[in-house]
Amino acid sequence: MEVTVIQETPWSRALDAARRTIGKEPLHKEPSDNWKAKVLLAEHSPIKLVEYCIHFKNLRQWVGVHLLRHEHMLPFIHSQREDRRKLNCSRDELPQGSENDQDFVVNAQTLINISRKRLCKCASKETQEAWKAVKSEIAKQDIVMADKMVPNCVYSGFCRELNC
């Protein structure tokens, strides 16, 4: 499995939207890391304007299903239709573990929400590994965003699964 992440929209978009809500003019500039951290922790709506595209190459089909179940994630999954690609067997015979290329468009709020569930020790090991790879790619671009991608026990201060 390979993962790449591209930040599609800049943080300046969120800053300008937040300024608009308090009657200030847009600045059209990148906000400070301190501002990003505060707005992410507060989970204010402008963070939904910061969008990322996650590209998975050779992701197990069933791991992708775990990820696409989250609301506000927009999936683009390589079709398994026999009229769209050459398969070695019929579509009905493909195992759940078959690998597939999958892209997901998400925003900063969605990254926080998915991390709460998919970084949890109760998530499947394979799904945790896939999401940790996403977090690692995010960290290369935006350590502030990556720092807010935590499991539910860290987010809430206790294990909601009563399992930690």
Can you annotate each of these PLM segments?
Residues M1-C164:
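Family-specific signature for flavin-dependent thymidylate synthase
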